[in-house]
Amino acid sequence: MERVETQPLGYLLHRLTSALRSEVTVTVLTPLGLSFPQYLCMRLLSQSPSMSNAQLARGINVSPQAMNRVVRGLQKRSLVVRAAVVPSGRSQPIELSFEGAELLKRTNSGVRAAERRVLAEFGEQDRRDLLKLLATLGHG
């Protein structure tokens, strides 16, 4: 069996991501009628309001066509809105609605609980250190 220190980082991150995504989807998102891409879209919009479909697609690494389906699903539930007036160009900025922001608040607490379950073998300081390392790597 290969030692953990010699396994490729991408493989280890994929395993962690898969475990976390599964836990979040089953315990938090599915009961609320959300998909993981919808949650990520709402999260991005909460951090950077008025994003275009293309910006959202790049933000969660999906095609613009796939993001359009995600946004339409959120629009049908009144969780996001497209601006009625376009400031410039062709893209209609997308924003989180009040209902979407409220649902995201509820979702975030469940996501945090799912993270704690997935990382249950870590102590609190180890979890904080891991989050700091991942944040640093993600901005590099």
PLM segments and residue spans:
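C-terminal regulatory/oligomerization modules of transcriptional regulators
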Residues: 1-2, 125-140
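N-terminal leader segment of winged-helix/HTH proteins
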Residues: 1-32, 136
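Short glycine/proline-centered loop/turn elements that form peptide/ligand docking sites
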Residues: 31-35, 66-69, 73, 123
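Residues within helix-turn-helix
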Residues: 53-54, 65, 72, 92
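N-terminal helix-turn-helix DNA-binding core of bacterial DNA-binding proteins
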Residues: 22-63
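Short, locally clustered residues in the helix-turn-helix/winged-helix DNA-binding domain
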Residues: 17, 43-47, 108, 135
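Charged, amphipathic alpha-helical coiled-coil/dimerization segments
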Residues: 72-132
